[in-house]
Each structure stands twice: as C-alpha cells, then as structure tokens.
C-alpha cells in the first residue's frame, strides 16, 4: 500500500505521517513500513533539498525540474522497490504537492506537471490524506518552527489547489480538516484518529 500526506506548510502532515508509521509498525512490524518524504528520501535528494531551500533567485520552472528529477531518484531507489517487497510506504508530500505549489501556486501549467510525473513514476498513491488547516494558523505554526513563508495569497492558491485535487480524485484523496487553534496533543490525536478511520474503511 502506498499512502501519501499532503497539505500546506504548517498543516501537521509531517506529524501525522510519523504517527501513522508508528501505528502501522506496531501492527505489521517496523520492517514492513517505510516512512519517507519529498523533497528528499535518499542521501542525494536530502543534500539537494538543503541546497534548494537555500537557493536565491531560482525561477519556478527550474525548481519544478529539480523536484521532478528528485522524484525519479526517490521513486526508483526507495518507493517502488519497497512496494515490490509488499511494504507499506508512507510519504510526506508527493505528486499533489507539486501540482498545488508549482501549478496552482506558481502558475505552471498543471498538464505539464502531470506529463512530467507520468514520465518519472508508474505507480500512484492508493490513499492520499490532505490535512487542511486555516492559512493564518498554518503560518503561525510555520513561524514557530523557524520556517520562512511566501505571501498569504500564494498559500490561498495552494490550498485551493489541494481542494481541486481532492475533488478530481475523490476515491484516492481524503481531506481531513484540522480546526484547532492551539495544536495541542488532543488536536493531533483527533486528526490521527480520523486517518485511522479512513484506513479501516478501505
């Protein structure tokens, strides 16, 4: 099974991907669950990730092509081999983030992004959890974590992108709304339990 978590920065998707990995590891064994992320996932990609996040003046198309190349590396080295071994793969960000951020957010033609994704992968997620959160709350969380962020209009476009992706892929995508303002342990557990409920129905 291939599971992905998506959402805007500060949505809590990384926390949820880790919680799900721990939960499934207790059931199926730690050796049968693979937790990974994009951009990243391999030693090479993690190095490139660090460089990209520090890059100044990189245009949106160049950034997209970097992400697509990294996805290919990640897919052939980590994701597909793990799936071939019947392992459960949980990925923090995947194709939908590219469509939402580079497509809806930065204005690159989504059909081009789809073509590039089709070029570098041949297996798609079985289930995608889109963790939705208020823009102001997400930016507040991101600031607390020391992350830089773009203008709010950009994040509204990205959030709308995730909504559209979910509407176009209702059998794969499940939107879970985090309405919390404090993001304490109860809020985190609420989202986690919603994730588990969805998994129990598939």
UniProtKB/Swiss-Prot annotation:
ATP binds at residues 7-14. Gene3D superfamilies: P-loop containing nucleotide triphosphate hydrolases. It comes from the Bacteria. It catalyses: dTMP + ATP = dTDP + ADP. CDD domains: TMPK (cd01672). Its EC number is 2.7.4.9. One of its GO terms (biological process) is dTDP biosynthetic process. Pfam families: Thymidylate_kin (PF02223). Phosphorylation of dTMP to form dTDP in both de novo and salvage pathways of dTTP synthesis. Belongs to the thymidylate kinase family. This is Thymidylate kinase. The gene is tmk.
